[in-house]
Amino acid sequence: GLLLNGKRLFLRGTNAIPTQWLAGYSEEMAQRDVALIKEAGLNAVRVHAHVTHPAFYEGCDREGVLVWQDFPLQWGYAPDEAFAQEALRQARAMVEVLGAHPSAYLWCAQNEPTHNRHALGPLLGAALRAADPTRPVKEASDFREHPYPGWYWGHYRDFLALPGAPLPSEFGAQALPRAELLRRV
């Protein structure tokens, strides 16, 4: 499990994927999103495959919401040395910009990598560890550890052997909380 200040912490989290262009994501919207996270009784958020508005991180710091921060790499990329060097530069810059936020508790190097998982993951993971040796680093949020049994594949009993444990990066699927709401849709 996760330890925070020497005490076990059970994470109750969600995923933050922007529903609008980041250029249009205002300070007020960021503050509202953090307030909604708190209102939902959550204590953690994964900023999924992007770096978001500074006000979001400031709000998470203020409200005690932990941030799993993805580096904005999604799926596959050409095995190009210039691309790898630019990704390294940006990973270091992300830590420089966000590393002072006490809410940031984990860096993740890429989301759902395909053919390049064994190239970019270790490369960026090492760069993130070197830039911030105080936080854990996950080399990839790998689709093979995203349990959606009964939704995309598998069976609901597959939850008994949780892939990515103890900290899966994705879990479950979209659902309405009550059958009556599903009938309304």
What are these regions (language model features)?
Residues 44-185:
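Substrate-binding/catalytic cleft of secreted carbohydrate-active enzymes
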Residues 1-39:
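N-terminal carbohydrate-binding accessory modules
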